[in-house]
């Protein structure tokens, strides 16, 4: 007799859909539980068996919480814009709107086959204009805001305009102008100043350009695409940026508010990269024609300032052309061209050969003006980090050491230590060779020396103590078609303005030709009718922005839209947002441990500042599921031929087998190899459960109206206790193991006590919902078990009358025995000695010591 899984699973999936079993009552008075999966990018390949792992875990918890009396929000949607979809469309020749819809339909079909309890009435896609209307709305709010450093929060740009009108730039770390000067600036001049404060701004920056992809890549995306074989070079372009750096402190500090894996917290902290140090200017021997007096650098090691023997400026730094002497101009320009062909990843490679060119210019060391210091350019310094220039201390920095060795530059030790073969970097040694007519720090440790140098620099007004972040502003524009249009218009007057909010969504035009131009222009530049825009308030004709948003944009706020997906007026009803946020549990791959989470947190904090959300953080608890590898223990890949399709597994063994096996493989966070034999084993377990409730033919369902024995109640309540403990802790494998123990205990018996086995069905339901629903129905119940009360353990059946005591001889485990819970020391030792195995070991030996650890072990020491 075999469990008819195909018939059962088909029936219950149809039942859940028709009865809308998992639709959330969003205004329910029950306690809420918001359980969210990172929504997938719907690729043409469809799901493989690694995808359902996280989905099954959240489904188990969601079903468990419903049965515990919670109102559960458990939605699903699609992160469907972006470069992969566009590339796939170009390969197939089919428009991305069509391929994306087909891919979504396939993903949805596969997910529904697994029996996941999503509320499909809340399904969303980032490509839906009704959705990206609010992605564009958030963009406009960011564009129309600035970050007030005094309040440490965003404000309307109108507040900044009022401030400039009343007091100029007084009190801001910005070039100074008064209110009268502000009023006399032209609209273009005013806009240029405001752009330096807006949370969205344009900047001419060196970007990562990929000719083959026809687009700019964010620094964070380069590694992925280079890994796929694409060449990425540096190219100066005018790009839209988001001022995420304004939120660096809050992004760092508020990590204390969340319950995330330690490794993820560490990655977030490292990416933000807070460091304290000294910002100081090294003056030119004579000021430049532009009036620039020196090169500004930031260092975390002020104590090593006397060890500076040269300076390095990034090749793409704007001052390079200004500081290069005529004699060095050709060499410098050739080097700049060569370095532009390298990605930041290549340039940061620690073991690469150091290259560079002398600019012909010198500065002097402000701590020791007698020291004339040459200024070089080298690609191991990046313009986007710090100030784009460094003071090089080769004695105490390995990259500087290698560069100095390559070019024969001086190496001056200023910290006690050995530097003959490598740089010596220490914060525990004292300073040497660090004295001048200006200041001396000889004999001081790192802390004292750094503090003294900073105080001296501030007193001389040539430097200041500063907090620096590794975090860079977010490169937000992409030169591609398949993304959210940016709702800005450029006017001939030189002013850029957002379109009125009443005109949102700005719908992506339907282009037949959507391949990259190769010039750096987006394909949207081809939409001639769409490009032209007339300002409704002034009548001025402008040109729409043709770049589109990155794929990250739509995924920054989707968790809010699930709460109120049909709201046409606002991204989420404030009352509902207040009830349902933050997300209680967020589950997804660790590959999103930095970027998606960082960008979502940034947007959420901005929305908090403008009153659109009520919480400081979007995601309370975070869990990363481990990868499921192929049977060959390598990452699943079409090229390796080791991909396992869930459709095939479900067809052969059923959805409940797939669910149970993926949860039984091991701890959720661990990397685990797939095993078809393992699925077969779980399938046999489901058949044993089926036979436990049936005898003879399929129809002979059996439950007995008999009182359970104390032993039966004991195993039941032990199972109830274990499952109740393990599900909230994501210990699904040990919960399933306990369910297996239960079945093993009951299978040999001819008794089928109804009270016990009905409770077992409810315990099984979160893990294997199809078979559980069918058994529940066959037991005579008229309703789905989805909202039945989850069993709770009765403490009286959890009391153990016996304990297990292990026996060691000379500290090595030799045997074990059961004893009464209150066994005395003498009885426990006596029982241990009388075990057959122990008797054999003790024969002819002298017991020198007897040790008893109450309730745990007996250790006999023999000579």
UniProtKB/Swiss-Prot annotation:
Keyword entries, A-Z: Aminoacyl-tRNA synthetase, ATP-binding, Cytoplasm, Ligase, Nucleotide-binding, Protein biosynthesis
Subcellular localization(s) per the UniProt record: Cytoplasm
Xref: Gene3D superfamilies: 3.10.20.590, HUPs, Isoleucyl-tRNA Synthetase, Domain 1
PROSITE patterns: AA_TRNA_LIGASE_I
CDD domains on file: Anticodon_Ia_Leu_BEm (cd07958), LeuRS_core (cd00812)
Residues binding ATP, per UniProt: 638
Catalyzed chemical reaction(s): tRNA(Leu) + L-leucine + ATP = L-leucyl-tRNA(Leu) + AMP + diphosphate
Motif stretch ('HIGH' region): 40-51
GO molecular function: aminoacyl-tRNA deacylase activity; ATP binding; leucine-tRNA ligase activity
UniProt entry tagged with the keyword Aminoacyl-tRNA synthetase: yes
GO BP field: leucyl-tRNA aminoacylation
Main subcellular localisation: cytoplasm
Cross-referenced InterPro entries: aa-tRNA-synth_I_CS (IPR001412), aa-tRNA-synth_Ia (IPR002300), Leu-tRNA-ligase (IPR002302), Leu_tRNA-synth_edit (IPR025709), M/V/L/I-tRNA-synth_anticd-bd (IPR013155), Rossmann-like_a/b/a_fold (IPR014729), tRNAsynth_Ia_anticodon-bd (IPR009080), Val/Leu/Ile-tRNA-synth_edit (IPR009008)
Enzyme class, first EC level, given as a word: ligase
Family: Belongs to the class-I aminoacyl-tRNA synthetase family.
Protein name (Swiss-Prot/TrEMBL): Leucine--tRNA ligase
């Amino acid at each position: 007799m075999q469990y008819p899984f195909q018939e059962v699973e088909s029936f219950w999936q149809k039942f859940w859909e028709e009865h809308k079993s998992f639709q959330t009552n969003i205004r329910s008075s029950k306690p809420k539980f918001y359980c969210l999966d990172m929504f997938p990018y719907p690729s043409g390949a469809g799901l493989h068996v690694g995808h359902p792992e996280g989905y099954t875990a959240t489904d188990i918890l969601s079903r468990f919480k419903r049965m515990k009396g919670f109102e559960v929000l458990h939605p699903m949607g699609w992160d469907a814009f972006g470069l992969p979809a566009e590339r796939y469309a170009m390969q197939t020749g089919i428009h991305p709107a069509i391929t994306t819809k087909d891919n979504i339909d396939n993903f949805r079909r596969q997910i529904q086959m697994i029996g996941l309890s999503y509320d499909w009435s809340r399904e969303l896609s980032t490509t839906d204009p009704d959705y990206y209307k609010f992605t564009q709305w958030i963009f406009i709010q960011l564009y129309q805001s600035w970050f007030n450093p005094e309040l440490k929060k965003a404000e309307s740009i109108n507040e900044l305009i009022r401030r400039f009108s009343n007091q100029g730039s007084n009190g801001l770390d910005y070039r100074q102008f008064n209110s009268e000067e502000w009023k006399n600036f032209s609209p273009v001049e005013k806009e240029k100043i405001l752009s330096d404060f807006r949370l969205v701004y344009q900047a001419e920056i060196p970007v990562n350009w990929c000719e083959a992809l026809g687009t700019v890549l964010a620094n964070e995306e380069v590694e992925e695409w280079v890994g796929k074989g694409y060449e990425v070079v540096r190219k100066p372009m005018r790009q839209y940026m988001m001022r995420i750096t304004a939120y660096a402190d809050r992004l760092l500090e508020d990590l204390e508010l969340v319950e995330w894996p330690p490794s993820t917290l560490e990655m977030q902290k490292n990416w933000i990269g807070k460091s304290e140090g000294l910002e100081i200017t090294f003056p030119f021997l004579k000021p430049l024609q532009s009036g620039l007096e020196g090169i500004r650098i930031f260092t975390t090691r002020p104590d090593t300032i006397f060890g500076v023997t040269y300076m390095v400026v990034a090749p793409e730094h704007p001052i390079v052309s200004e500081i290069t002497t005529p004699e060095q101009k050709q060499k410098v320009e050739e080097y700049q061209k060569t370095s532009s062909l390298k990605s930041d990843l290549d340039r940061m490679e620690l073991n690469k050969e150091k290259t560079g060119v002398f600019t012909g210019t010198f500065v002097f060391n402000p701590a020791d003006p007698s020291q004339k210091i040459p200024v070089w350019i080298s690609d191991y310094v990046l313009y986007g980090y710090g100030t784009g220039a460094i003071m090089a201390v080769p004695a105490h920095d390995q990259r500087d050491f290698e560069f100095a060795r390559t070019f024969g530059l001086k190496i001056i030790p200023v910290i006690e230590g050995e530097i003959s073969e490598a740089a010596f970097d220490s914060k525990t040694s004292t300073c040497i060779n660090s004295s001048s007519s200006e200041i001396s720090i000889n004999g001081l440790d790192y802390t004292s020396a750094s503090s003294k140098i900073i105080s001296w620099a501030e007193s001389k007004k040539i430097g200041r103590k500063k907090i620096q972040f590794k975090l860079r502003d977010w490169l937000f524009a992409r030169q591609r078609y398949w993304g959210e249009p940016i709702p800005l218009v450029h006017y001939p007057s030189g002013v850029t303005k957002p379109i009125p909010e009443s005109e949102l969504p700005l719908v992506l035009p339907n282009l037949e030709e959507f391949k990259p131009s190769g010039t750096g222009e987006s394909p949207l530049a081809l939409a001639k009718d769409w490009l032209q825009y007339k300002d409704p308030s002034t009548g001025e004709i402008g040109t729409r922005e043709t770049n589109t948003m990155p794929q990250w944009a739509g995924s920054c706020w989707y968790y809010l839209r699930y709460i109120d997906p049909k709201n046409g007026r606002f991204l989420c009803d404030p009352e509902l947002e207040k009830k349902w946020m933050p997300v209680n549990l967020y589950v997804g791959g660790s590959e999103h441990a930095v970027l998606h989470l960082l960008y979502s947190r940034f947007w959420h904090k901005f929305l908090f500042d403008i009153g659109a959300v009520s919480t400081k953080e979007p995601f309370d608890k975070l869990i990363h599921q481990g990868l499921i590898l192929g049977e060959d223990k390598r990452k699943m890949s079409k090229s390796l031929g080791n991909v396992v399709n869930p459709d095939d597994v479900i067809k052969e063994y059923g959805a409940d087998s797939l669910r149970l096996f993926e949860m039984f493989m091991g701890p959720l966070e661990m990397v685990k190899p797939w095993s078809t034999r393992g699925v077969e084993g779980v399938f046999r377990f489901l058949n044993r459960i089926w036979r436990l409730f049936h005898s003879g033919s399929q129809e002979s369902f059996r439950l007995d109206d008999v009182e359970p024995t104390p032993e039966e109640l004991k195993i039941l309540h032990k199972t109830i206790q274990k499952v109740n403990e393990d599900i909230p802790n994501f210990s699904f494998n040990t919960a399933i193991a306990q369910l297996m123990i239960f079945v093993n205990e009951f299978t040999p018996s001819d008794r089928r006590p109804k009270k016990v086995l009905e409770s077992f069905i409810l315990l099984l339901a979160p893990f294997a919902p199809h078979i559980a629903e069918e058994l529940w129905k066959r037991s005579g119940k008229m309703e789905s078990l989805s909202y039945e009360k989850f069993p709770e353990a009765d403490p009286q059946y959890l009391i153990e009358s016996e304990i297990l005591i292990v026996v060691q001889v000379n500290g090595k485990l030799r045997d074990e025995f059961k004893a009464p819970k209150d066994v005395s020391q003498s009885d426990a030792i006596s029982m241990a000695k009388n075990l057959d195995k122990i008797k054999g070991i003790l024969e002819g030996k002298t017991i020198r010591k007897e040790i008893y650890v109450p309730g745990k072990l007996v250790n006999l020491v023999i000579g």
